[in-house]
Amino acid sequence: MNAPLASGRPDIQSADGIWHCCHLLPDADPDRAVRDAALVVEQGRIAWLGAEAELPADYRSLPRHDAGGTWMTPGLVDCHTHLVYGGQRADEFAMRLAGASYEEIARAGGGIVSSVRATRAADEDTLFSQAAARLAPLLAEGVTAIEIKSGYGLELEAERRQLRVARRLGEAFGVSVHTTFLGAHALPPEYAGRADDYIDLVCNTMLPALAEEGLVDAVDAFCESVGFSLAQTERVFEAAARHGLRVKLHAEQLSNLGGAALAARHHALSADHLEHLDEAGVEAMAAAGTVAVLLPGAYYFLRDTNLPPIALLRKHGVPIAISTDHNPGTSPVTSLLLMMNMACTLFRLTVPEALAGVTTHAARALGAPDRHGKLAVGRAADFVLWRVESPAELAYWFGRNPAAVVVRQGRIHPATSQHGGRA
């Protein structure tokens, strides 16, 4: 049996068998690339990979999938998104073009609080259908694992709806979803002037309930002058620790409050944004093993001019991840490949750094380096076949999706198997 690439057969679902006639990049290290390679999938997991000429005899009778000379990489990992929310905020785009700052939009009643109103008003099915439409292009581009935050409810029931929708998306689309509780995202209107009281609600009511329901994989906060203070953020981190949950942090996006160092003290999975990060913060992250998650979409959309300290991150050996930061206000982007290009062009990352940023390092930012971001025997079959001459093209093109086939959790993504990457 030979299952050709893009065969047009809608009944192709299982990825079990031999994937051959491909070139293999098992992780982001170009020195580990294998030309004329093969990969064997059994019961949805990788059973063998290497040069096709060395394929063990025991596997040679398995069904075959002709990869057509494509490049195979691990599935991509989008490690920072706000995918579930109500409505959109195109009106704020016009305000920003007219010169309004992030802080000015927030103080005028826009920003996060605007999305809070729309999210609170939406039922679960509405949130699901809207989020599914945003997820589709990411999946078609090869995303096989994604983090989804709450943070647009800012009350227990609305936060619960967001996290339940995130779980539903994973089940419905066969994608690995890692949920993050971001109750400390902004101050809801009913708590105006009472930030400490709201943090009480986050730590003592919302987080315990949502953790008990199994809806939370990690906990995040927005540590900024328009968000929450270091002391308030630390309270959230301490509450997370009581529930055995790892933390991450929106830090040093608009100013340097020392959030990255605080995150490192709590052994955070990641500190994200980091445009105003200083060397002390970099050193703290390096010592703690905290991943730096760069979000070039927000940098571009906000027309920022303060670059993250790439040279310092390299100097101190801090792993660098890249993500879409998909959200309605500052990064309404649904292309992780575009973020790779922007990370290279705007932040001057190398192509191998960009590839690591959406595979191995992004998996580490999720606390799942043993599950995502690398092709290895025993792992779930999450991989992408790309119609490119070299993996460098993944960061080179923008406005084009070269994905030919996406396999998630051992299943062939039907849209890409039939239509060459278009959802």
UniProtKB/Swiss-Prot annotation:
<feature type="binding site">
    <location>
        <position position="89"/>
    </location>
    <ligand>
        <name>4-imidazolone-5-propanoate</name>
    </ligand>
</feature>
<feature type="binding site">
    <location>
        <position position="330"/>
    </location>
    <ligand>
        <name>4-imidazolone-5-propanoate</name>
    </ligand>
</feature>
<comment type="function">
    <text>Catalyzes the hydrolytic cleavage of the carbon-nitrogen bond in imidazolone-5-propanoate to yield N-formimidoyl-L-glutamate. It is the third step in the universal histidine degradation pathway.</text>
</comment>
<dbReference type="GO" id="GO:0019556">
    <property type="term" value="P:L-histidine catabolic process to glutamate and formamide"/>
</dbReference>
<dbReference type="InterPro" id="IPR032466">
    <property type="entry name" value="Metal_Hydrolase"/>
</dbReference>
<comment type="similarity">
    <text>Belongs to the metallo-dependent hydrolases superfamily. HutI family.</text>
</comment>
<dbReference type="InterPro" id="IPR005920">
    <property type="entry name" value="HutI"/>
</dbReference>
<keyword id="KW-0479">Metal-binding</keyword>
<feature type="binding site">
    <location>
        <position position="250"/>
    </location>
    <ligand>
        <name>Zn(2+)</name>
    </ligand>
</feature>
<dbReference type="InterPro" id="IPR011059">
    <property type="entry name" value="Metal-dep_hydrolase_composite"/>
</dbReference>
<keyword id="KW-0378">Hydrolase</keyword>
<comment type="pathway">
    <text>Amino-acid degradation; L-histidine degradation into L-glutamate; N-formimidoyl-L-glutamate from L-histidine: step 3/3.</text>
</comment>
<keyword id="KW-0408">Iron</keyword>
<feature type="binding site">
    <location>
        <position position="329"/>
    </location>
    <ligand>
        <name>N-formimidoyl-L-glutamate</name>
    </ligand>
</feature>
<dbReference type="Pfam" id="PF01979">
    <property type="entry name" value="Amidohydro_1"/>
</dbReference>
<feature type="binding site">
    <location>
        <position position="250"/>
    </location>
    <ligand>
        <name>Fe(3+)</name>
    </ligand>
</feature>
<dbReference type="GO" id="GO:0005737">
    <property type="term" value="C:cytoplasm"/>
</dbReference>
<feature type="binding site">
    <location>
        <position position="80"/>
    </location>
    <ligand>
        <name>Fe(3+)</name>
    </ligand>
</feature>
<feature type="binding site">
    <location>
        <position position="82"/>
    </location>
    <ligand>
        <name>Zn(2+)</name>
    </ligand>
</feature>
<dbReference type="GO" id="GO:0008270">
    <property type="term" value="F:zinc ion binding"/>
</dbReference>
<keyword id="KW-0369">Histidine metabolism</keyword>
<dbReference type="InterPro" id="IPR006680">
    <property type="entry name" value="Amidohydro-rel"/>
</dbReference>
<feature type="binding site">
    <location>
        <position position="327"/>
    </location>
    <ligand>
        <name>N-formimidoyl-L-glutamate</name>
    </ligand>
</feature>
<feature type="binding site">
    <location>
        <position position="152"/>
    </location>
    <ligand>
        <name>N-formimidoyl-L-glutamate</name>
    </ligand>
</feature>
<dbReference type="GO" id="GO:0019557">
    <property type="term" value="P:L-histidine catabolic process to glutamate and formate"/>
</dbReference>
<feature type="binding site">
    <location>
        <position position="253"/>
    </location>
    <ligand>
        <name>4-imidazolone-5-propanoate</name>
    </ligand>
</feature>
<feature type="binding site">
    <location>
        <position position="152"/>
    </location>
    <ligand>
        <name>4-imidazolone-5-propanoate</name>
    </ligand>
</feature>
<keyword id="KW-0862">Zinc</keyword>
<feature type="binding site">
    <location>
        <position position="325"/>
    </location>
    <ligand>
        <name>Zn(2+)</name>
    </ligand>
</feature>
<dbReference type="GO" id="GO:0005506">
    <property type="term" value="F:iron ion binding"/>
</dbReference>
<dbReference type="GO" id="GO:0050480">
    <property type="term" value="F:imidazolonepropionase activity"/>
</dbReference>
<feature type="binding site">
    <location>
        <position position="185"/>
    </location>
    <ligand>
        <name>4-imidazolone-5-propanoate</name>
    </ligand>
</feature>
<feature type="binding site">
    <location>
        <position position="80"/>
    </location>
    <ligand>
        <name>Zn(2+)</name>
    </ligand>
</feature>
<feature type="binding site">
    <location>
        <position position="325"/>
    </location>
    <ligand>
        <name>Fe(3+)</name>
    </ligand>
</feature>
<protein>
    <recommendedName>
        <fullName>Imidazolonepropionase</fullName>
        <ecNumber>3.5.2.7</ecNumber>
    </recommendedName>
</protein>
<keyword id="KW-0963">Cytoplasm</keyword>
<feature type="binding site">
    <location>
        <position position="82"/>
    </location>
    <ligand>
        <name>Fe(3+)</name>
    </ligand>
</feature>
